[in-house]
């Protein structure tokens, strides 16, 4: 899977990757609660960027946002990743035992 020009070895069909994704999503939820308490725009941007960065580290083991300071770019990267994961999930769910001959 390509993320921000980096090849990342992630497949949601692989048990360890699925578990890492679930952990990353749970951790992200906790961080969102902390971010909501922030008062300044710069703190919100900084902490939200860090949340997305940590999400990728937790989910894939790769720091794909290491040099990213643009919140919009971080959000787009996250959204792209989720689309890719969704496509992988659809392939898994399309499987049917009746397809085996």
Model-derived segments and their meaning:
Residues 1-17:
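Short, extreme N-terminal segment that most often corresponds to the first beta-strand
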Residues 15-101:
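Short, surface-exposed, charged amphipathic helix/loop patches that serve as local interaction elements
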């Amino acid at each position: 899977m390509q993320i921000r020009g980096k090849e990342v070895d992630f497949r949601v069909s692989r048990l360890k990757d699925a578990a890492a994704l679930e952990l990353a999503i749970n951790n992200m939820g906790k961080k969102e609660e902390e971010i909501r308490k922030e008062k300044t725009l710069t703190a919100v941007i900084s902490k939200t960027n860090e949340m997305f960065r940590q999400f990728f580290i937790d989910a894939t083991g790769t720091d794909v946002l290491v040099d990213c300071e643009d919140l919009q770019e971080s959000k787009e990267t996250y959204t792209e990743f989720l689309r890719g994961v969704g496509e992988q999930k659809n392939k898994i769910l399309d499987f049917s035992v009746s397809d085996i001959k």
